């Protein structure tokens, strides 16, 4: 659809941003598939026939998610997804950094295509390039998290801090990196989203 829109409106300066947001959003869903099912098909075209779809290795899905996020990151906004305004509920740099941090943290698992052989990759040998520096997956996790913290996110403090994140009206939390708009007035259709279906 984006390619069709680009042809129809070739001078639209927001096309690059929209394309990066869609790629990063798709990468997030592939991350969920990777985390829950490991080996899933990677489909990048809406015209591919089902007979041509093949199951990908876990390491291939890992590499795909990583590539999509790393390539999309520069074109994403540095705004907060949780803040009211133009980028509310949209994919931003902090969201991509959050997914990359989770990807790096679990890289030993996600790059292991044969989890039955008792041999697993060593995280010290799984390299990421972050801010122009090649680092192992553990160091990459810290760097991605530092980017998020530098963007103004933090852990909620106090006795009720953690539980406050799960309250019905938690829109003011400084922990909310990526939000799903659920305002009963502005976003009525999203109120049907099953908030606890994954956990």
Language-model features, listed with the residues they occupy:
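Conserved, well-structured interaction surfaces
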Residues: 1-37, 49-86
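Outer-membrane beta-barrel translocator domains and adjoining extracellular loop/strand segments
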Residues: 44-48
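Short, flexible active-site-proximal loops enriched in glycine and acidic residues
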Residues: 37-43
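An aromatic- and glycine-enriched ligand-binding surface/loop that stacks and positions planar moieties
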Residues: 40, 70-71, 75, 90-199
């Amino acid at each position: 659809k984006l390619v069709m829109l680009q042809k129809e409106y070739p001078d639209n300066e927001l096309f690059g941003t929209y394309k990066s947001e869609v790629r990063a959003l798709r990468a997030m869903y592939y991350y969920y598939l990777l985390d829950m099912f490991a080996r899933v098909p990677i489909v990048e075209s809406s015209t591919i026939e089902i007979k041509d779809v093949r199951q990908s290795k876990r390491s291939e899905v890992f590499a795909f998610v990583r590539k999509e996020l790393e390539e999309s990151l520069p074109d994403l906004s540095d705004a907060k997804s949780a803040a009211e305004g133009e980028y509310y509920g949209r994919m931003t740099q902090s969201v991509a950094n959050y997914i990359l941090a989770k990807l790096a943290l679990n890289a030993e698992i996600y790059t292991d295509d044969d989890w039955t052989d008792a041999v697993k990759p060593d995280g010290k040998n799984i390299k990421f390039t972050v801010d122009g520096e090649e680092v192992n997956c553990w160091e990459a996790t810290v760097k991605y998290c530092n980017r998020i913290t530098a963007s103004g996110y933090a852990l909620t403090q106090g006795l009720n801090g953690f539980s406050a994140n799960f309250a019905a009206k938690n829109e003011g939390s400084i922990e909310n990196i990526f939000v799903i708009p659920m305002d009963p007035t502005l976003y009525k259709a999203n109120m049907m989203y099953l908030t606890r279906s994954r956990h």
